[in-house]
Every structure is written in structure tokens, then in C-alpha cells.
From Swiss-Prot:
BP GO terms, sorted: embryo development ending in birth or egg hatching; establishment of cell polarity; intracellular water homeostasis; microtubule organizing center organization; mitotic cleavage furrow formation; positive regulation of TORC1 signaling; protein deubiquitination; proteolysis
Gene Ontology cellular-component terms listed: cytoplasm; microtubule organizing center; nucleus
Catalytic residues, chain numbering: C579 (nucleophile), H1134 (proton acceptor)
The protein's name in its UniProt record: Ubiquitin carboxyl-terminal hydrolase cyk-3
Source species: Caenorhabditis elegans
Length: 1178
């Protein structure tokens, strides 16, 4: 059976063969181990896998782990299955192997009396939730499991509960709203506004299973508004009214203090069943068809389905499923004969794929099945979606693919006869894409050919935006990265850009003039190039010189019906990541005096004469003027500004590459180019007089006198002189239109004396901005078991735990010395306390920025004795039998799960086990169901009685709440229990406590909804609003003018010493056209990168009065004439423009697309550049 021992050097102990090992285990155990081993990809187990999957992550010292691995592997680098089986069974089941192993390796001596368990026995300690639910209801374990599968598909996955919205969706609009709402309240036993799975199972059992009188009695809860399980006179009156009970039959007995118990209603209902039949029938239909309960018999299924179909046949549902009439008739006959029905068979109405695009490319829509052409009403029946899903669960489907036909019921506008009908034949869309391969010559600037990408079967009522969203979801694209085109001819010109997202596909299909029976249409999904930002179709148009046609310009009902007749309403083709240029040009073009200047041929000739050397600025200006002329000629719907972009490339290296750039920088650069060429032109026409009069010494003397005069000159005079000098040196139309004046003051912080400097500006850059604060929400848990309260705080990013404790103490009224902060990850793991894990308290100096993302913060009240080692954190825990294949029972035989709120357990010198248990029970009384309610919708277990003992066991565990906190790791102990008696308890340092729940008590007495209940302090809403609320233009200007203390001291003439100064920037004078730059991009020093502030800035489109923020206001107001928006990130975002037309209408200018929008449709959220025009007071 075994071999002789070898030396410790290769760490191999005597083993048995794999064949011998099989005789010590059952066939089921062998299959389990074999299945668990098959999960390893390479057919063997390496050291890391051995530590995790076999040893279960237990904190065994490294040396012993290595020794065990060598024993299992026979000294090899990996473990084969035979070696695993023989070693595992030998150590767990064979006494001779165990004794020889221990003799050789004394450090494993504890395995002599208690060897590792190969298999964990299944007993009540590890009973599953399904078994508990089956035990207290009339449902089997399999029925509970099946219900859970359905519940997962209809509930809110984030919280695993049914809210009212999800409840209505599950019912599919097939029942009266009032009835659905009241039945929801019946299922919601704890009245928290949600139905958890336990409530669903128990209520379904009460309504649909067991003795009929009990089921009928539960129906009375529909009218039990106050949830006291009794019907008052008012509730009885409402019941009689809803059921249309005549007065002579209003005879429900009142057996409980003048009120009717549920059983009284049940007795009355059996005697007067004709009044309650409809309500009870609807409850059965909802329970079985909508919520997933399988009918007990074929007779019951036939009854439920017949009543449901009769109810739903005339309902105005928007969506139906199509089923073959033949199978439906067969189903009915089988159920009537008490035979098992065949699976759903729609082959009789299923169409072919011969001419379908689904046979060539993938389908991205939910369905791709086609119906046979020319079906008549007798070929099929329509059924509500909930019934179709129920049939799938109960009977399955004969066809593995293309078996489901979900169709919409549409208004008459979608059909030739203008009558509402079922859309039997949806549109089939073939989606083309650009070939991702390089062109034959290897360049990127050649138009790509179109190729079939995918298809979709969608309703005519679907809008362009909805179809585009479907495509972007499939490709995981962001906003602005894709758009749709209507294909007229593949790989030829004439495709139509679908820029009107509200347009439905029926309108597009009708515009093609195809016959009704075709039902096919080709669309192009254009995706922007990731690296260059180029739109392939705009590149095609640019190279070919062809026009791009947008659907909005062709729509008969569009107000912008003929953009070619409207000056300036022209799109600009983006063929090289030039959206920042296009947006800037469209905005700047709305400055009427500047545009009119360049439209005048004489002015352009003057610029050419004044810039004879034709410098870079002149070239850019001339090309800009040509571009404006083409835009205002309005002979084209869109223009490819090739020559202008070439001039930009030659003028500056800044914009040479095809990467994304800043629209504000481009506008500033373009204005500077325009100004330079205008200035040179003016200078050549009006040369300035010679300035060479006088000597250099005279000039120096004049300069000294000027400096002396500055000291006594008033700010008004200084500003006027500075402005006059600036105008004289920068004479141009750009200066007249765009230049304003700022005042920069340095204020002595000691004597308050100040000095001013005046500076010109052409755009006002305003901070939004990035606040150096983070938002924290902390749940304060009191020891008296009251409902926890959540507080909100905004703290600086360098705050520590101590700062958080301080503000929590002030808000909650708990002294700081009686608070501990605990951080729990989204997986229920408490954050490490300190490097040596000697304390349960997070260190005050720990930065809050170290908390993981999505973590929950708790502030727990400590007991009166608050010494460092006089309290412990307790966590709820459950041990559940592992039904999945595992290798070693001691480490993987059950699953350890943590849940719920952490608790604080006090440890004074005289603490006993009973005192610990009572302390935990006291803190949990809020979410424990204490009394057994005789009217509940389920049976009750003896453990629910408060006199049956504690429903949990307190165990000493390690800081991870996985293993024992005091036993050696080789014992594989999950936690030593604390006895609930009067004996004193010793709890080692760094040893928290686990609250191990008995399964039945956990599933029946622990109310998870109440445990999660939390009251919000007003500070939560207040801090949230402050943190995420939109800013305003006024607030941004105020931040712009906030004092900033300089780093270095400056000599003060009045103080006669160096003093600290505050620098204050204010607006002295505004220009005719004010460009405001909202600084969304700033450098984040903590993260070492540029970041974007996405906060919305509210600003007026009309009647903006800047007077409160201007030192010398003139009483004029401003009106917004254009704005450039940015979406996405700096390196891969997209710019668009909104601008006013000559007719004072707002236009959306998105590269080549131009569409008229209302003022309300102007998107302010992404505003980046604002262009305001002054409205002078007459």
C-alpha cells in the first residue's frame, strides 16, 4: 500500500496509489474532486493554485505550504490528478498515511486527532435558503429555485428587489392599475416600497398554494390599508364597492373587536364566490404567468391561460408576441386531455432566410426572425409578452433559433390604409461600414469603400437616435463618435446624413419610394477615426469636391428647408480632426462687422496691398475671407475648407498635426492673424510720424517723469492713457471689436495701499472650476439600535480620518472620543486598520483619499469604556454549504459570506459571554422580527420564538473574518465560538468577532430591508447640491476677481519695507463683442494630468447685464450670438457650435451638418466658448 519514507530533503511522504485511494471515498466524492480538478487549464495544479484552491487561502506559514505542496506533487513543479487524489485521500482518510506523515513532520501533529475533512457533511447548520423557503411554504425546493431565476429577470438587479416600476413591467399592462398597485402592497409585507425574494415566495405560496380557504383569506389583504390583518368598516366598505356586492350580501362577520379577520373574509368569500372570482383569478394569473410559478396541474394551466387570454384580447398593448394558430390549438387540446403539451412550434409561420441579410452578417437587434409573407389572421394569434415568456418556461421551444416574433402595435400613420394595426413585417436594415483596411496605395487619405457590417430588424416607429444608440452600444462608442447615413448608392456620392435624431425610420423608408412588400433599407454607420478624428464621409466629400446632403435640409416640414438660400447657414467638412476649427469659425463668423469687413472686396484688396510680402498672417486672413465669401454665397450646403486649413498649417506649427486641439486657442490665434494683417494694412495706408525727435537721454528723462506721474495719477487717467497707447500701437478692426481692459491691483496686506496696472484682453478666461474638496457620506450607527442616520460632508482632498471624525462628532452629537470610523468595501470587507493590525480603529492620520472607490463609510458609536482594547468590531456572517465541486472540505466545503452593518461590542474587564450576546441582540432589535405573526403568509419555525435561544453564534475570527482568530491555521478553524453563559471571556488583541447566523433564523427573522434602512440628514442633500449643482456665469466672474496672495513679499513705499500683497483682477472695460472662455481644462497636480470639469455653467442667452462686475459700467446689456460646446475629453472630444443666423434663428452647426433649433434646444451644458454682442442703449 505504501512505500518507505524518503528524507526531508525532497519532502516526500509515503502515499497510496490513486486506485487504492478510490476505495476510501464514495463515487460522489470522486466525481466532485474530478470535476473540481478539470477546471485547471493545463491539467495540473501549480503552487499558487494549490495555495488558493486546495488550502483555501488559509494563513498557513510559507514553509509549511511549500512542504505540503512538495508532498502532494512528489517533488515535482506541478500536481497531477493521481497525485492529488492519492495524497488528499491519504491525509484525510488513511490512518497509516496520517501517522507516518505526522512522524516525519511534527509541525502537523494537530492533524493526528483532527485531520482535514475531505467532505463537509450536509446538515442543518449549512441548510440553503431554498430549503428554508420550502420548509415554511407550500412550495418545493425546485419551485423556489425556478422562481428565483424568474425573479432575477424581472427585478432591479442593483438591489435584487422589485420596485413598483419593475412590478408594472412584469405585469405587462395586462391588469387594472388600481388592482396592480394594491396587490403590490400585499406582496410588500414590510411596507418598504419594494418586494424582496422572500416576500415574493411567501406571498405566492399563500395566494396560489395550499388549502383554498387560506388562499382566499389572503385576498382580503388587498383592502387592508393599515396592514393590521383586519378589515375595518371603511376597508369593508371599499371591498364591497370594488366587488360590486349588493347590500343584502354584505355580511362579512366581525369577529375581532368590531373588525373582520382575514379568516372571516375567507368564509364569506367561499359562500359568495361569484363576487371574488375575478379578483382571485387575476391573482392566480399574475402569480403564475407574470411572476414565474408553474401551475400545479394541466387543468389549472388551461384555466389560467384561458382567463388571461380572454382578459388581454382587447387590451391596447403596444407590444405582442405572434404564435402559430396550429400550435395554440394543439396546446389547448393537450391540456384538455390532461397530456403534456409539445414545445412551442412556430415553424408554420416562420419565413425563410434565403433573401435575408441575417444569413450574411450578424444581427444586432433583439430578434431576427421573419414571418412568412402574406399571413392571414387565421394563421396566427397574438399574445401578451408575459404569456409568451410563461409558455417558454413551461414548455420550451421546438425551434432553437428564430422562434420568437415580437411585434409592435402601431398607429395608422405607419400603414397605407391609415388604420392602427400590428406591424407583422418590421423593417430590415442592412448597416454598412467603412472598410477598416488601408487603401491599396497604403495611405490614410483615400476614401474607404463600404462593406456590410451588421443588420437589424426594427420597427418603423424607431427613431434615428434610437437606432444609433443601438449601434453605439454594440460597438461601445461614446457620444459624437458615430452617425448614420441613408445609403442611396453604395460607394457613390449622394448619401444623406441623418442629422435629425427625432426622424423615424418609416419617414426614411417612405422617402425612398419603395413598395410596401420590400421592407428593406440600407444605412451607413460612419465611425470617426480614433487616431485622427476624421469622418470618412467628410474626407470623401473633401477629396471629391462633392456636397454632403443632410436629412434636415430635405425634410418637408423643417423650417430650414433650403439652407442653400441662407447666407452663413453652411456646414464645414471635417476631414482631419478639425472640429475645433469648424466650431471656432462658425462662431466668429457671427460677428457681423468683422464678417462684413471681409465680404467687402475693397477691404480685402487693401490687406493684399498692405501685406505685399504676403506673410503668414496675410495668407491666413485672405483664405479666411475667401471662406466667408463662400459661406455667405450660400450656393453649397457644406464646404470643405481645404485652402484655409492649408494656410493654418503653414502659419503655425501649433495646429499642424491632426490631433485634437483647443477651440479657444484656435480662435485666439485666428484673431491675432486677422489683427496682424489689418494692422499692417492700416500702417501702410496711414504711416505714423517719425519718433526720432530728441535724444535717448531725453526719452529716458521722459520715462522717468512718466513713472513719477504714475504714482500720483488716478486710475481713471491711467486707464485712459494706457488704452490710448494700446489703440495707437494696435490699430485694427479686431481691436475695436474684441479688445477690453482689465485692471490688475496689488494691495498691501499691511496698510491696504494699492497700485494698478491696466491690461488689454480679447477673451475673458473664467475659472469654473475644480474645487479642492471631495464629497463624503457617512452613516452614523448608534448603539441603542435606532435607525442609522447618514450625513454629508465636503472636505478638502488632503483631509485625514481625524478630520472626518471631528465633523461627524459635531453633526451627530456623539463625542469624538466615542466614535470610530470604519470603511467597508463594496464586497463587504473592512479596510485594514493599521500596519500592525493591533487596533480596530482607523488611524486619525490616515488620508481619506486612501479609501477605495465605492466604499461605504460608517461612524460607529463606542461603548462607555473606550480604551484601545475595550471594544471590537463585529460583522454578520453566514456559512453556506458549497454545492459546486471542490477539493478539500475543510477549506472549500462551505462558502463564507459577510453582510450587513458592522457592530461595536464592548469589552470591559468583567465581560461575560452572555453579556456579549445580549449586547449584540440589543443593537439588532431594530431589524429582527421578534413576534410570530399568526396571519403571516408562511409557516413558522420554532427557532423564531424568542425563547428558543440566540439565533446566532459569536465567534472569534481573524481581521478578514474568514478564519479563526486564535487557532493555528493548520486546524482550518472558521472561528472558535463564544459560549453564551456567565463565564468571563478573553478576546485576544486584533481579534474581531463574527456573528454567525443559524440559516433558518437568518432567512426568517433577519429583515434585510430594515437593516439597510437609513435616514438622511439635510446635510446629505445640501452637500450633494453644492457639490454637483450647476455654476453660473456670475459666479465664475466672481471667482475670476477673487484676491490671490502672492508668494513673495514686495517693497511697499508707505510701509517702507517688504510686505505681502494680494493681487486682484477686475474688469475695467468690456468690448463690443465679448468672448468668454470657460476654463474646463485644468492641470490636476495631485493626479499629474489634465482634467476636465464637466460642471454645467448657467448663462443667459439674452439680457446679460455685466454691470455688477465691471469697474466702469456703461449700462449696456449683452446678447449671446454664438457658443462652442465641447463633449468628451480633451484628447478625444468633439466641438460643435450653436450660432444665430441672419434671421435671428439659432442654428446647430456640427461640422458639415446644419440644423435649425429652438432657443430651448441650445445645449448649455457643454458650453466652452461664449460670444456676446453688446446691445447699446439708444
Amino acid at each position: 500500500m505504501g512505500n518507505t519514507l524518503t528524507g526531508r530533503s525532497n519532502a516526500i511522504a509515503p502515499i497510496i496509489s490513486a486506485e487504492d485511494a478510490k476505495t476510501y471515498i464514495s463515487d460522489e466524492e470522486y466525481r466532485r474532486i474530478r470535476q473540481a480538478f478539470q477546471r485547471f487549464k493545463n491539467g495540473c495544479i501549480n503552487y499558487d493554485e494549490f495555495c488558493y484552491h486546495v488550502l483555501g487561502g488559509a494563513q498557513i506559514p510559507e514553509e509549511k505550504r511549500r512542504l505540503l505542496f512538495s508532498f502532494f506533487s512528489h517533488g515535482a513543479e506541478t500536481i497531477s490528478f493521481d497525485n492529488l487524489l492519492s495524497s488528499l485521500v491519504g491525509l484525510c482518510r488513511v490512518e497509516e498515511v496520517q501517522s507516518r506523515f505526522i512522524e516525519e513532520y511534527h509541525e502537523f501533529a494537530s492533524w493526528g486527532l483532527s485531520p482535514p475533512k475531505l467532505t463537509i457533511p450536509l446538515n442543518d447548520s449549512y441548510i440553503s435558503f431554498y430549503e428554508v423557503m420550502s420548509y415554511v411554504t407550500h412550495l418545493s425546493v425546485n419551485e423556489v429555485i425556478e422562481l428565483e431565476k424568474v425573479f432575477a429577470t424581472i427585478s432591479d438587479r442593483a438591489v435584487c428587489k422589485l420596485n413598483e416600476e419593475k412590478w408594472k413591467q412584469a405585469l405587462g399592462g395586462c391588469f387594472p392599475d388600481s388592482y396592480a398597485e394594491r396587490l403590490f402592497a400585499v406582496f410588500d409585507e414590510n411596507r418598504d416600497g419594494q418586494i424582496d425574494f422572500r416576500e415574493l415566495v411567501c406571498t405566492l405560496s399563500a395566494l396560489c398554494r395550499g388549502p383554498l380557504p387560506g388562499r382566499i383569506s389572503q385576498l382580503a389583504r388587498i383592502w387592508d390599508v393599515d396592514c393590521d390583518k383586519l378589515l375595518s368598516d371603511e376597508e369593508l366598505s371599499n371591498m364591497y364597492k370594488d366587488l360590486n356586492v349588493p347590500e343584502e350580501h354584505q355580511t362579512v362577520t366581525k369577529s375581532s373587536n368590531g373588525k373582520s379577520a382575514l379568516v372571516d373574509f375567507g368564509i364569506w368569500a367561499q359562500e359568495n364566490e361569484k363576487y371574488v372570482n375575478e379578483y382571485y383569478s387575476m391573482a392566480l394569473q399574475i402569480g403564475h404567468i407574470c411572476l414565474g410559478l408553474r401551475p400545479e396541474s394541466r387543468k389549472m394551466e388551461l384555466q389560467i391561460v384561458n382567463e388571461f387570454e380572454k382578459r388581454a384580447s382587447e387590451l391596447p398593448l403596444s407590444e405582442w408576441n405572434i404564435v402559430a394558430s396550429g400550435w395554440h390549438a394543439e396546446l389547448r387540446s393537450f391540456l384538455e386531455a390532461d397530456k403534456n403539451p409539445n414545445p412551442i412550434d412556430n415553424s408554420g409561420i416562420k419565413g425563410t432566410r434565403e433573401d435575408s441579410w441575417t444569413s450574411k452578417v450578424a444581427c444586432i437587434s433583439a430578434e431576427s426572425a421573419r414571418l412568412k409573407p402574406d399571413l392571414i389572421p387565421s394563421d396566427y394569434i397574438r399574445v401578451p409578452v408575459p404569456l409568451w415568456r410563461a409558455w417558454l418556461r413551461w414548455h420550451g421551444c421546438a425551434l432553437t433559433v428564430d422562434s420568437q416574433f415580437t411585434r409592435k402595435y402601431l398607429d395608422g400613420e405607419f400603414f397605407e390604409d391609415n388604420k392602427p394595426a400590428l406591424e407583422l413585417y418590421p423593417l430590415e436594415i442592412l448597416l454598412l461600414g467603412h472598410d477598416r483596411k488601408k487603401s491599396q496605395d497604403g495611405t490614410e487619405n483615400t476614401p474607404r469603400s463600404l462593406t456590410s457590417w451588421a443588420c437589424a430588424q426594427v420597427s418603423r416607429s424607431m427613431t434615428v437616435d434610437e437606432l444609433l444608440a443601438l449601434c453605439k452600444t454594440e460597438l461601445r462608442l461614446g457620444d459624437g463618435d458615430a452617425r448614420l447615413w441613408q445609403v442611396v448608392k453604395e460607394n457613390e456620392e449622394g448619401n444623406v446624413l441623418l442629422d435629425d435624431g427625432a426622424q423615424n425610420l418609416h419617414q426614411l423608408y417612405s422617402s425612398l419610394g419603395k413598395t410596401k412588400k420590400v421592407n428593406k433599407m440600407k444605412l451607413l454607420l460612419e465611425v470617426r477615426e480614433r487616431g485622427t478624428g476624421v469622418w470618412p464621409e467628410e474626407l470623401r466629400a473633401s477629396l471629391s469636391g462633392k456636397q454632403i446632403t443632410a436629412a434636415s435640409t430635405l425634410s418637408s416640414n423643417a423650417q430650414l428647408s433650403d439652407s442653400s438660400g441662407r447666407p452663413g447657414a453652411v456646414g464645414l467638412v471635417n476631414y482631419g480632426n478639425f472640429c475645433y476649427r469648424n466650431a471656432g469659425i462658425q462662431c466668429l463668423a457671427r460677428v457681423s462687422p468683422l464678417t462684413q469687413y471681409f465680404l467687402d472686396e475693397d477691404n480685402l484688396d487693401a490687406i493684399k496691398r498692405g501685406n505685399l510680402r504676403r506673410g503668414d498672417a496675410a495668407e491666413t486672413t485672405i483664405e479666411y475671407a475667401k471662406l466667408l465669401r463662400e459661406m455667405w454665397a450660400a450656393k453649397k450646403k457644406n464646404i470643405a475648407p481645404n485652402d484655409f486649413n492649408d494656410a493654418i498649417r503653414l502659419s503655425s506649427d501649433m495646429f499642424e498635426c491632426s490631433e485634437q486641439h483647443d477651440c479657444q486657442e484656435f480662435v485666439a490665434f485666428l484673431l491675432d492673424q486677422l489683427h496682424t494683417s489689418m494692422y499692417e494694412s492700416n500702417k501702410s495706408l496711414h504711416p505714423s510720424p517719425e519718433e526720432s525727435e530728441g535724444t535717448d537721454s531725453n526719452k529716458l528723462s521722459d520715462s522717468s517723469k512718466k513713472k513719477e506721474a504714475d504714482k500720483e495719477e488716478a486710475d481713471e487717467e491711467k486707464a485712459e492713457r494706457s488704452w490710448t497707447e494700446y489703440e495707437k500701437q494696435n490699430e485694427s478692426l479686431v481691436t475695436q471689436l474684441f479688445t477690453g481692459q482689465l485692471r490688475s491691483r496689488l494691495i498691501c496686506r499691511t496698510c491696504q495701499s494699492s497700485s494698478s496696472v491696466f491690461e488689454p484682453f480679447t477673451s475673458l478666461s473664467l475659472p469654473i472650476g475644480f474645487e479642492d474638496v471631495d464629497l463624503y457620506q457617512v452613516i452614523v450607527v448608534h448603539r441603542d439600535g435606532r435607525i442609522p442616520r447618514r450625513y454629508g460632508f465636503r472636505l478638502s482632498r488632503d483631509s485625514k480620518v481625524g478630520n472626518l471624525r471631528e465633523v461627524v462628532a459635531v453633526s451627530s452629537g456623539i463625542s469624538m472620543s466615542h466614535l470610530t470610523i470604519q470603511c467597508m468595501s463594496s464586497k463587504g470587507t473592512l479596510m485594514s486598520r493599521s500596519p500592525n493590525h493591533r487596533s480596530s480603529n482607523l488611524r486619525d492620520e490616515l488620508p481619506l483619499s486612501s479609501f477605495p472607490s465605492g466604499a461605504r463609510l460608517y461612524a460607529l458609536e463606542l461603548p462607555e469604556s473606550t480604551g484601545e482594547d475595550q471594544w471590537r468590531v463585529a460583522m454578520h456572517r453566514k456559512l453556506q454549504y458549497n454545492h459546486e465541486p471542490y477539493i478539500l472540505g475543510s477549506t472549500a466545503g462551505f462558502i463564507v459570506s459577510r453582510f450587513g452593518l458592522p457592530l461595536i461590542v464592548g469589552l470591559d474587564e468583567e465581560v461575560t459571554g452572555k453579556k456579549l450576546y445580549e449586547d449584540v441582540m440589543y443593537q439588532m432589535h431594530r431589524f429582527m422580527e421578534h413576534s410570530v405573526n399568526s396571519s403571516s403568509s408562511r409557516a413558522h419555525d420554532p427557532c423564531e420564538d424568542e425563547n428558543s435561544g440566540y439565533p446566532f453564534t459569536l465567534c472569534l475570527v481573524d481581521p478578514n473574518y474568514e478564519w479563526c482568530g486564535q487557532c493555528p491555521a493548520l486546524r482550518f478553524c472558521r472561528g472558535c465560538p463564544i459560549r453564551p453563559d456567565e463565564s468571563k471571556v478573553f478576546i485576544p488583541a486584533n481579534c474581531p468577532i463574527a456573528v454567525d447566523w443559524l440559516p433558518i433564523a437568518l432567512y426568517l427573522r433577519y429583515n434585510h430591508s430594515q437593516e439597510q434602512a437609513c435616514e438622511d440628514d439635510p446635510s446629505v442633500a445640501e452637500t450633494w447640491s453644492r457639490h454637483f449643482a450647476p455654476s453660473s456665469l456670475e459666479h465664475c466672474i466672481e471667482k475670476f476677481s477673487c484676491p490671490e496672495t502672492l508668494d513673495a513679499a514686495i517693497q511697499c513705499d508707505r510701509c517702507e519695507k517688504k510686505t505681502m500683497r494680494d493681487k486682484v483682477m477686475t474688469i475695467w472695460k468690456l468690448p463690443k463683442y465679448l468672448i468668454i472662455h470657460l476654463k474646463r481644462f485644468e492641470f490636476l497636480r495631485e493626479q499629474g494630468r489634465m482634467g476636465k470639469c464637466k460642471r454645467t455653467v448657467n448663462f443667459p442667452l439674452k439680457h446679460f447685464d455685466p454691470a455688477p462686475f465691471v469697474d466702469k459700467p456703461d449700462g449696456n446689456t449683452y446678447e449671446c450670438i454664438a457658443l462652442a460646446n465641447h463633449y468628451g475629453q480633451l484628447s478625444c472630444g468633439h466641438f460643435i457650435a450653436y450660432a444665430k443666423s441672419n434671421e435671428d434663428k439659432w442654428l446647430l452647426l456640427n461640422d458639415c451638418s446644419v440644423r435649425e433649433v429652438s432657443e430651448e434646444e441650445v445645449d448649455k451644458q457643454g458650453a466652452y466658448l461664449l460670444f456676446y454682442e453688446r446691445k447699446d442703449v439708444k
